């Protein structure tokens, strides 16, 4: 009995020490480039734009991971400008714009966003969000927001997947919780009823609705983010569902749920 009590106390002290882990910095570097060619419909310079950004966390292992995501070399103002000017779609659009102007049609300006940021952290994990968005002269822009959870304090950290945080055989239960959250989301956002919401989910997803790998910590539990068009029409945006800790008991590993209590997000 004494040994068990001593072991429990030791584990408590270890976790308490981890809770005091050094805070991460939310500092980031944003680089913006423009490439202008001709005039827009108001007679102003028509400029294509590219925005690139990356975080500076102050943790050598995490910052090294960030560097790898940037192709092994952090971008500079010059490299971003060069990339935009040399982009084949920019060159092709400039040619098409010349034809549009001759035909009395509106020219188009391309817009790209490629950013990585630290969204938050816990004593043992860091959450990164990557925004990859573009407007290429269609009805609207389109992009994806990818979440990555990494273990802190180790070299070459690997993304934490659902299988890494779930207890054995619990994925179906997690999927059910997320689906129920989606039903509520549809009822509130579309001003419909539960029956029509469930019918919509089946019509759009068939029997393929599943828990997404795109997750992060939240002070109240775990948050799951779906991309535009992934589980519903574009008008629904990017549905995001936070499942409370109490509902995840017996589904997600206790040590993961414990981390959520100490989650700190970017302000």
Regions found by a protein language model. Name each.
Residues 1-7:
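Bacterial N-terminal signal peptides that target proteins for export
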Residues 21-267:
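Compositionally biased intrinsically disordered regions enriched in Thr/Gly
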Residues 8-16:
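Bacterial N-terminal signal peptides
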